[in-house]
Swiss-Prot record:
Key words of the record: Apoptosis, Cytoplasm, Cytoskeleton, DNA-binding, Microtubule, Nucleus, Phosphoprotein
Region (Necessary for interaction with RASSF1 isoform A and isoform C): 666-1059
Modification Phosphoserine occurs at: S321, S472, S582, S640, S655, S657, S731, S759, S809
Annotated spans, Necessary for association with microtubules: 714-966
Name the record gives this protein: Microtubule-associated protein 1S
Chain positions found as Phosphothreonine: T638
Stretch list, region Necessary for association with actin: 960-1059
UniProt organism field: Homo sapiens
Length: 1059
């Protein structure tokens, strides 16, 4: 991905390399950059007899060639090679392009060389901002000490006179500390290094012409040029919980979405917003969260705000064709903005204060930012979104403390928690710490330890509702909440419905027994449909004894065929108001898949349905994907009165859920179906007629990184977190045109230290590979089944035999094709099971000997299928539960099925989901008879007990180096994201990675952990090479930083994680 080679020809006696960093978001930086370029050129004391610099600069202006990189979008190279001078000007380069050109310059035999580093740089450290990441003295020394360069120089005869390399760089920040290190490098490099010498040459006509030309090339682009409109129309619909992780340069940028609500977190340091190619396909971004103000987090967001203002001006001015204007005016509407307005913590030298700029732009747009701070104990979340039958999105603020001066200066640390309506779907927990110091972050988490959903690796609403159902006093509340979600409660009483009551997961009124049934059914059914079906029937008979209507419903669910019928022909049935009931079966797979989909051996994957990591034979995966693809796009739901008023009524939390005409979230946007571009290594599902919504069905968040699969990884082997199902492909409306092609971690060939254990992705040019995948029109050359055949993954809830039916019912779950406020459904519509008689209680397997515990688990699991026939009834991998659990990696927590806590709600902080160590409680101890499930407060949470998350960013900025072993002991996530390619992060990278390894080996849960870096680093490569052998034993997968997402006819760097 190197740009046009700028030097390296022995014929040229002199070489000039000018590097200008990232594009400018503001005109004020242009003057500063031109001054730096002039200072650098005039400081070059090249002998006029050898090179007439004034004349050569004039020749450059008239004869140079301009090249736009086809691999690094936005990078330009101005190059000219004459008899006396070879000149290369790199504009807006990536870090890899800069490294390549620096190597070329160092190896160039020219006797006189000049390197000028100019561009936007941080005031505090002097770090130069590039298109991707930054360039600091630390990075520069890494290049000078590169082993490859030294080896090449050692094999060439030494020159009579050592070449002279003049370096002009910022004179402040950490660059001032570079001078002492320079003398020690001269001998090994056979160079005379001169750092920031004073001006030697006078101003000249040639220099003026050169600077004028460069100024024209550096003219800040208009908002429409910086953030280009898409080439094709259509809105993107994200129906399942997911998180897009973008390369944020010096900072971070992420996009979290659930069905009906989207959140943009920070904007990254690049004015050419890394998230733009995704959000331009959305009609609305419901919330924007800025964790901290600064040059590392706001430039990308400010570019979006500038474009929105430019669109307003365009509309006011009129002119142009309607079609053209419509194509350009496509930025999404913005909802609430969370931003602790204050002076930027970091800013660019001679640049604008990004925080002040953001406030100004928001004011012009009529948006008032809302500050965030931690409230009093007990912590109460801010309800961002809540909709009956869909779910609730809460935001907990862990930092900063309540109002005060400290609040305005500190970074925000926010925990987003998605509570789905379906009792069997997975509760999703995602942490965005910003620059919060780990100590403050952990202090904030201590205040949340009473929350049951943080005590288990995988939690579902039914786990949380179990205890409450045993209490008769809560029957009214549970009935109300169930009604509000459109569920048919065990004892429905319309007159007592209170739509405003805070949503409680659908099976609140059911007995603990239901929890067990539902928790077990999905995974067991999936493993062995036949046994599970046969066992479920007796279970259903018991339910029938309690209620005739329920008997009918459950009978329909008990058999795979009956279950399939209602789902496929749901359109003929009355509107399904008890959405949560069918959702579990339909969406259970998508809820549980989360984070763990990173790689674990096939044998272990079978036992980790909760994390949906289990690979299956290619043929089997195809059977699942193709049928599902034909009927799986959720239909936009029409607004329902209940959904609109529920957040406000009866809820003690502050509700910020926007009320949009016709629908909440992207659901309301009309979507245009367009062809999908298939990238190599995507599962067979991509080839299906309706696989345009690949982003949902093929989320390639994680990649299985198994050393033996090197060939496959070359092709972009990817492993989706959830089973590759195209549940919603049936509808032509909600189209998610996104193909994800994650890249495995790889080593650069230039680094000889990475031999055999080198990262799975063995390609040298990661960006080149990414570009190949991005342009994936040649997918046919690489059979889509390559991924399926090598490492296909099935979510624990992916129904194989009844795939089509499952897809349909899932569609019902998502949209039901009817307004959520429709009347209660026909009693035959799969209502939640009745509570078990009070005399029945579950035996806690953890209190039994391992063998007995496994038997109990198997039995209860196999019965449970009836409760959720729609999604699991046909799953083939059910029986070998005990055996699967004993297989490492996913066995521990993954094996603790997402729906694992059958009778023990996650509130039992003490109940570890049955894992291969099922006989040993992981966090707290419960009573043997399961009575704890009827006593919510029985288990006390230890003072510093760990919290479990699905995805967590590691603190960045000044707090990056403070992340230690204790942090990983207390914050246990299935996915960790390392972002912020700044100097501090690079210097402290090894210590953080070692802390993860040291901490992971002491976890009492055998969890599969995926590490997702947003940038490439030498420290990461070195660590990977030295510790790779331990990764599989510890259950750690490291992804590459060059994952690509292909959407319609475009691609952009990002890693998508689906939960």
């Amino acid at each position: 991905m190197a740009a046009v080679a700028g030097s390296g020809a022995a014929a040229a006696p002199s070489s000039l390399l000018l590097v200008v960093g990232s594009e400018f978001g503001s005109p004020g930086l242009l003057t500063y950059v031109l001054e730096e370029l002039e200072r650098g050129i005039r400081s070059w004391d090249v002998d006029p007899g050898v090179c007439n610099l004034d004349e050569q600069l004039k020749v450059f202006v008239s004869r140079h060639s301009a090249t736009f990189s086809s691999i690094v979008k936005g990078q330009r190279s101005l190059h000219h090679r004459g008899d006396n001078l070879e000149t290369l000007v790199l504009l807006n380069p990536s870090d890899k392009s800069l490294y390549d050109e620096l190597r070329n310059l160092l190896l160039d035999p020219a006797s006189h060389k000049l390197l000028v580093l100019a561009g936007p740089c941080l005031e505090e450290t002097g770090e130069l901002l590039l298109q991707t990441g930054g360039f600091s003295p630390h990075h520069f020394l890494q290049v000078l000490k590169d082993r490859e360069i030294r080896d090449i120089l050692a094999t060439t005869p030494p020159p009579v006179q050592p070449p002279i390399l003049t370096i002009t760089c910022p004179t402040f920040g950490d660059w001032a500390q570079l001078a002492p290190a320079v003398p020690g490098l001269q001998g090994a490099l056979r160079l005379q290094l001169r750092l920031n010498p004073p001006a030697q040459l006078p101003n000249s006509e040639g220099l003026c012409e050169f600077l004028e030309y460069v100024a024209e090339s550096l003219e800040p682009p208009s908002p429409f040029e910086l953030l280009e409109p898409p080439t094709s129309g259509g809105f993107l619909r994200l129906g399942r919980p997911c998180c897009y992780i973008f390369p944020g340069g010096l900072g971070d940028a992420a996009f979290f979405a659930v069905n009906g609500f989207t959140v943009l977190v920070n904007g990254g340091s690049n004015p050419k917003s890394s998230f733009w190619k995704l959000v331009r396909h959305l009609d609305r971004v419901d919330a924007v969260l800025v964790t901290h103000p600064g040059a590392d987090s706001l430039p990308g967001l400010n570019s979006l705000l500038r474009r929105k203002l430019a669109e307003r001006s365009e509309v006011a001015a009129g002119g142009g064709s309607w079609d053209d204007r419509l194509r350009r005016l496509i930025s999404p509407n913005l909802g609430v903005v969370f931003f602790n307005a204050c002076e930027a913590a970091s800013r660019l030298a001679r640049g604008e204060d990004e925080a002040e700029l953001a406030l100004s732009l928001l004011a012009q747009l009529g948006i008032t930012p809302l500050p965030l701070s931690r409230g009093p104990v007990p912590a109460k979340p801010t309800v961002l979104f809540e909709k009956m039958g869909v779910g609730r999105l809460d935001m907990y603020v862990l930092h900063p403390p309540s109002a005060g001066a400290e609040r305005t200066l500190a970074s925000v640390c926010a925990l987003l928690v998605w509570h789905p309506a379906g009792p069997g779907e997975k509760v999703v927990r995602v942490l965005f710490p910003g620059c919060t110091p780990p100590a403050c972050l952990l202090d904030g988490l201590v205040r949340l330890q009473h929350l049951r959903f943080l005590r288990e690796p995988v939690v579902t609403p039914q786990d949380l509702e179990g205890p409450g159902r045993a209490e008769s006093k809560e029957s009214v509340g549970s009935r109300d909440s169930s009604k509000r979600e459109g569920l048919l409660a065990t004892h429905p009483r319309p007159g007592q419905e209170r739509p405003g009551v805070a949503r409680k997961e659908p099976a609140r009124a059911e007995a603990p027994r239901k929890t067990e049934k539902e928790a077990k059914t999905p995974r067991e059914l999936k493993k062995d449909p036949k046994p599970s079906v046969s066992r479920t029937q007796p279970r259903e008979v018991r339910r029938a004894a309690s209620s005739v209507p329920n008997l009918k419903k459950t009978n329909a669910q008990a058999a795979p065929k009956p279950r399939k019928a209602p789902s496929t022909s749901h359109s003929g049935f009355p509107p399904v108001a008890n959405g949560p009931r069918s959702p579990p079966s339909l969406r259970c797979g998508e809820a549980s898949p989360p984070s763990a989909a990173c790689g674990s051996p096939a044998s272990q994957l079978v036992a980790t349905p909760s994390l949906e990591l289990g690979p299956i034979p290619a043929g089997e995966e195809k059977a699942l994907e193709l049928p599902l693809a034909a009927s799986s796009i959720p239909r936009p739901r029409t607004p329902s009165p209940e959904s609109h008023r529920s957040p406000a009524e009866g809820s003690e939390r502050l509700s910020l859920s926007p009320l949009r005409g016709g629908e909440a979230g992207p659901d309301a946007s009309p979507t245009v179906t367009t062809p999908t571009v298939t990238t190599p290594s995507l599962p067979a599902e991509v080839g299906s007629p309706h696989s345009t919504e690949v982003d949902e069905s093929l989320s390639v968040s994680f990649e299985q990184v198994l050393p033996p699969s090197a060939p496959t990884s070359e092709a972009g082997l990817s492993l989706p977190l959830r089973g590759p199902r195209a549940r919603r492909s049936a509808s032509p409306h909600d189209v998610d045109l996104c193909l994800v092609s994650p890249c495995e971690f790889e080593h650069r060939k230039a680094v000889p230290m990475a031999p055999a254990p080198a990262s799975p992705g063995s390609s040298n040019d990661s960006s080149a590979r990414s570009q190949e995948r991005a342009g994936g029109l040649g997918a046919e050359e690489t059979p889509p089944t390559s991924v399926s055949e090598s490492l296909p993954t099935l979510s624990d809830s992916d129904p194989v035999p009844l795939a089509p039916g499952a897809a349909d019912s899932d569609e019902d779950t998502e949209g039901f094709g009817v307004p959520r406020h429709d009347p209660l459904p026909d009693p035959l519509k799969v209502p939640p099971p009745l509570p078990d008689p009070s005399s029945i209680c579950m035996v806690d397997p953890e209190m039994l000997p391992p063998k007995t515990a496994r038997q109990t688990e198997n039995v209860s699991r196999t019965r449970k299928p009836l409760a959720r026939p729609n999604s699991r009834a046909a799953a083939p991998k059910a029986t070998p539960v005990a055996a699967a659990k004993t297989k490492g990696l996913a066995g521990g927590d993954r094996a603790s099925r997402p729906l694992s806590a059958r009778s023990e709600p996650s509130e039992k902080g003490g109940r570890a989901p049955l894992s291969r160590k099922s006989s040993t409680p992981k966090t707290a101890t419960r009573g043997p008879s399961g009575s704890a499930s009827s006593r919510p407060g029985v288990s006390a949470t230890p003072p510093k007990s760990p919290v479990y998350l699905d995805l967590a960013y590691l603190p960045s900025g000044s707090s990056a180096h403070l992340v230690d072993e204790e942090f990983f002991q207390r914050v246990r996530a299935l996915c960790y994201v390392i972002s912020g390619q700044d100097q501090r992060k690079e210097e402290g990278m090894r210590a953080v990675l070692d802390a993860l390894l040291a901490s992971k080996q002491h976890w009492d849960r055998d969890l599969q952990v995926t590490l997702i870096p947003t940038f490439d680093s030498v420290a990461m490569h070195t660590w990977y090479a030295e510790t790779h052998a331990r990764h599989q034993a510890l259950g750690i997968t490291v992804l590459g930083s060059n994952s690509m997402v292909s959407m319609q006819d475009d691609a952009f760097p990002a890693c998508k994680v689906e939960f």
